[in-house]
UniProtKB/Swiss-Prot annotation:
Species assigned in the record: Campylobacter jejuni subsp. doylei (strain ATCC BAA-1458 / RM4099 / 269.97)
Family: Belongs to the polyribonucleotide nucleotidyltransferase family.
Occurrences of domain S1 motif (ranges): 657-718
Organismal lineage: Bacteria, Pseudomonadati, Campylobacterota, Epsilonproteobacteria, Campylobacterales
Main location: cytoplasm
Amino-acid positions noted as binding Mg(2+) in the UniProt annotation, renumbered to this chain: D506, D512
CDD domains registered for this protein in UniProt: KH-I_PNPase, RNase_PH_PNPase_2
Protein name stated in the entry: Polyribonucleotide nucleotidyltransferase
């Protein structure tokens, strides 16, 4: 059975009861993209008290007419992009599972055909949402996901991939009806063109350069965009419900009833409440856990407890602890560590504590500590990523890796490959910091965050430490960026918004809302809600309270930058210069022989831009780089047939304002070389000939506009 639904600028076609019928399968089409979403569950419940949900998102190479690269020509482990999309689907759907649901459940989304224009993340979430709604798992309504962009100052709903390239905002929102469940946002920087005059070995050039806008969003702009998203989500959720409610399977599922133990609850509250409250309020994280364990053992050893199971005692103790934490916050405005609701934990900062690293920062906030290290490299160090919707691999020049070892929370667990959580936290920090790093910065940058101690907000500590580590490595970042994690306690129509939450408040609270940005606005945010939805007024308070906390942290970070001493000795050196683009082939040599010899001889790395004639040499010592540059200049100026610049000719009889009927001898990306007389050329900059379709040997009337350093620049005669 097929349904075609027109919602939120998209035409979505769903086939139900057609494929994967042993599970609940939905085939969704949008444009030329085809996605299969399936939901399957086990018949037996798990004993543990958690939601056993697994989400997998798989992009098939054949969907884009590709064969997987590498030695193994098939899909193997998921890429980082696939893992992050799976996390988005998981975080959007998880809050809607009913309390007491304990059946192992798997949601699989497979991309079978990929249209480069279609947003696969939004499409995949909506396909998974419909499949879940059609299953026998009780869901109150289908989830809907949307993306909001901003082009020319206007918010647009569900931009396609081409439009997103020109957007200054990427806001992904999921919700059900009028409730928001999950938010991911990042600011997208753009470049502003400027003209500058630069002197180069081949020719002085008036060229285009760029400056970068971070495009942070204000709190009011975020709320405006979320309002647009909320309306679209309501529209989509209603449309899915109307189309598919009559096809939903009857639910025969038994939910686990939470077994109440009023006698245990009364006993603990009457006899141990003061001890529990003392443990919560007066202890550090590790001491608190130890003290609560002592209380549990004391109860278990009592004669009265012999009639109660250990599980019921521990569960009831956890409930009492949760209740006391929440009541204290709501009724007294006081948190477990004594802070007020909007207070940030004490912060300490040390920079460049690792003598041989390019840049480092030890950022400590309360009992959360991140060691963030910046490393600079050449173009060959960039991460190559093969995306399904891109024809060729793309180069990632700014990387953030987040590591969370077990010892950071006092656990004796082996350190393994990064999991979904590590990838997600690293991606959030990258999104927050990326707008502050100029895209034209010549070095590849890798930030590594080692979480040494964790008691909440470790991803935001990574953002703060990362921004300072960039400064410590001498990276000219546009602005400092800081992040803060916000929390929410909601009970009986009373609520409290918490700034800089610790682990206890994250675990026993109702929201995890991370906000990062500069003093001028927000660069990234992420929200996960446990309530089943949040209203705009609460969201507004959280955003403005986060701004207050963020600026407080940035003020401390600004003071710390005054103490930074960049270790120039360990930083890589780089030289960027231009040659005649036609000479790039001489630098490379036959089958790359010449460039390999240069790299081996001088111990440097070399990157070439054939179109612009740019040469980038990187190395550890200035002497090596200078020697390699001189060697390359010698190659490009000594090849047979090389046309030498005007500085090698006698230009003493040329004057400003002289007019010539010249001949176009060569066309380069930055302009045209026009022969004036006696083999002397003048440069006609590209900005002066945008409206012309020039060709070599074309006759052109020009006049001299500048003579400098033996070189001539010309303009067109009017």
């Amino acid at each position: 059975m097929q349904y075609s639904i027109e919602i939120n600028k998209n035409t979505e076609i769903f086939d139900i009861d057609k494929v994967a019928k042993q599970a609940t399968g939905v085939l969704m089409r949008q444009g030329k993209s085809v996605v299969l979403a399936t939901v399957a569950r086990e018949e037996k419940q798990v004993e543990e008290d958690f939601l056993p949900l697994t989400v997998q998102y798989i992009e098939k190479a054949y969907a884009a007419g590709k064969i997987p690269g590498g030695y193994v020509k098939r899909e193997t482990k998921p890429s980082d992009a696939e893992t992050l999309t799976a996390r988005i689907i998981d975080r959007s759907l998880r809050p809607l599972f009913p309390k007491g649901y304990a059946y192992p459940t798997q949601i699989v989304v497979m991309v079978l055909s990929a249209d480069p224009k279609v947003d696969l993340q939004v499409m995949s979430l909506n396909a998974a949402s419909v499949a879940l709604y059609l299953s026998d798992i009780p869901m109150k309504a289908p989830v809907c996901g949307v993306r909001i962009g901003k082009i020319d100052g206007n918010f647009i709903l569900n931009p396609n991939n081409e439009e997103l390239q020109n957007s200054t905002l990427d806001l992904y929102v999921a919700g059900v009806k009028d409730e928001l469940l999950m938010i991911e946002m990042r600011a997208l920087p753009d470049q502003k063109e400027n003209e500058i005059f630069i002197e180069a070995p081949y020719a002085d050039v008036l060229t285009q350069t760029t400056s970068q806008n971070m495009n942070e969003l204000s709190e009011d702009e975020i709320l405006e965009a979320l309002n647009l998203a909320q309306k679209a989500i309501l529209n989509g959720s209603n449309a899915y419900e109307e189309a598919f409610s009559k096809h939903k399977k009857n639910s025969q599922i038994e939910l686990k009833n939470e077994i109440e133990h009023p006698e245990i609850l009364a006993f603990i509250e009457n006899n141990f409440q003061k001890q529990i409250k003392k443990a919560i309020n007066q202890m550090a994280k590790s001491e608190r856990a130890s003290e609560l364990n002592k209380i549990a053992k004391e109860i278990l050893n009592l004669e009265i407890a012999k009639d109660w199971s250990e599980e019921s005692i521990l569960n009831t103790l956890a409930k009492v602890k949760r209740k006391l934490i929440r009541e204290q916050i709501l009724n007294e405005g006081k948190r477990a560590d004594g802070r007020s609701l909007n207070e940030v934990r004490p912060i300490s900062i040390e920079t460049n504590i690792l003598p041989n690293a390019h840049g480092s920062c030890l950022f400590t906030r309360g009992q959360t500590q991140a060691l963030v290290v910046a490393t600079l490299g050449g173009e060959n160090d960039a991460q190559m990523i093969d995306l399904l919707t891109e024809k060729n691999p793309i180069s990632e020049r700014f990387m953030v890796n987040y590591n969370f070892p077990g010892f950071s929370v006092g656990e004796a667990s082996p350190i393994k490959a990064p999991g979904r959580r590590e990838l997600g936290h690293g991606n959030l920090a990258k999104r927050a910091l990326y707008p502050s790093v100029d895209e034209n910065y010549p070095y590849v940058i890798r930030l590594v965050s080692e979480i040494l101690e964790s008691n909440g907000s470790s991803s935001m500590a990574t953002v703060c430490g990362g921004s300072l580590a960039l400064k410590a490595a001498g990276v000219p970042s546009l602005k400092l960026v800081a992040g803060v994690a916000m929390g929410l306690i909601f009970e009986d129509n009373k609520y409290a918004v918490l700034t800089d939450i610790m682990g206890l408040e994250d675990h026993d609270g109702d929201m995890d809302f991370k906000v990062a940005g500069s003093k001028d606005g927000i660069t990234a945010l992420q929200m996960d809600i446990k309530l089943g939805g949040i209203d705009q007024e609460t969201l507004k308070q959280a955003l403005y309270q986060a701004k207050e906390g963020r600026i407080h942290i940035l003020n401390i970070m600004e003071e710390a930058t005054k103490e930074i001493i960049v270790n120039e000795e360990v930083l890589p050196k780089l030289e960027l210069f231009s040659v005649d683009p036609s000479k790039i082939v001489d630098i490379i040599g036959q089958a790359g022989k010449t460039i390999k010899e240069i790299i081996e001889k001088f111990g440097v790395s070399i990157d070439l831009d054939r179109e612009k004639g740019e040469v980038k040499i990187a190395g550890s010592q200035n002497e090596q780089i200078k020697a390699a540059k001189d060697y390359i200049i010698n190659i490009t100026s000594s090849q047979k047939g090389t046309k030498k610049g005007s500085k090698d000719k006698d230009i003493s009889d040329f004057e400003l304002g002289q007019e010539f009927q010249g001949i176009v001898k060569k066309i380069a990306p930055f302009g045209a070389f026009v022969e004036l007389k006696n083999g002397v050329d003048g440069l006609l900059h590209s900005s002066k000939i945008k409206h012309l379709d020039l060709s070599e040997n074309q006759s052109l009337k020009v006049k001299i506009s500048e003579i400098k350093n033996g070189k001539i620049s010309v303009d067109l005669c009017e």
